[in-house]
Amino acid sequence: MKIFAVRIGDKYGPEYEDYLERKLSDYEVHWIREPYDDRVTLQWNKMKVMNLDIDEPVCVMDIDVLLTGNYKEIFDYPVERGQCLAMPGWWRDTEKEGYSINGGFFKYYPKDCKYIYDKFMLDIHGWQKHYIDNGVTRGPVNGEQYFVEDSVKERLELKLLPNEWFTRWAVSEDIVNR
């Protein structure tokens, strides 16, 4: 299985890549280190995978994760054509109703999600600002998970991994609940 992770910018060093390479050595890990388009910022570069000509499920994940226990169950969790599997949102950065995912992990068939990539590319700047401007999340760069969730619901079935498989460590509860 192919796993794609984004490390653009200097917030996370190469040690994060090394960690994931070790933990995911049974998989084919691909790194997105440069924007695929100069207009696309940071984590929004996950959209690139939705444009790949791959007709099998792939995983797309954040780099700032700690994998413990039977974590391979996450990557091996079944997904069918017409579905998009996501990590449940165990913390919220929005008060808006109707959002249930965390953008830290997706599994899908890229060919099924090509319409999401196309939609994004039609208005890159607009979509990167949309969820910030509408008060769904805070800037300067956020909102890609809301864009994906809204777009998935247009044509695909959104499936969530079991909630009890995930947690977040935070210094303060107000970080978890904002």
Residue ranges of each PLM-predicted region?
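Short glycine/proline-enriched coil/turn segments at helix->beta-strand junctions
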Residues: 24-28, 53-57, 80-83, 153-157
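N-terminal anchoring/stem segment of glycosyltransferases
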Residues: 1-43, 54-55, 110-111
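A structural signal for well-ordered alpha-helical segments within the folded catalytic domains
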Residues: 18, 44, 48, 142-150
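A generic structural motif
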Residues: 29-36, 86-89, 137-138, 143, ...
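GT-A fold catalytic core of metal-dependent nucleotide-sugar glycosyltransferases
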Residues: 42-100, 106-111
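Catalytic core and acceptor-binding pocket of nucleotide-sugar-dependent glycosyltransferases
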Residues: 109-178
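Short, solvent-exposed loop/turn segments at secondary-structure junctions
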Residues: 8-11, 35-37, 65-67, 90-93, ...
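Hydrophobic/aromatic beta-strand patches that form the interior of the parallel beta-sheet core
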Residues: 4, 30, 59-61, 85-86, ...
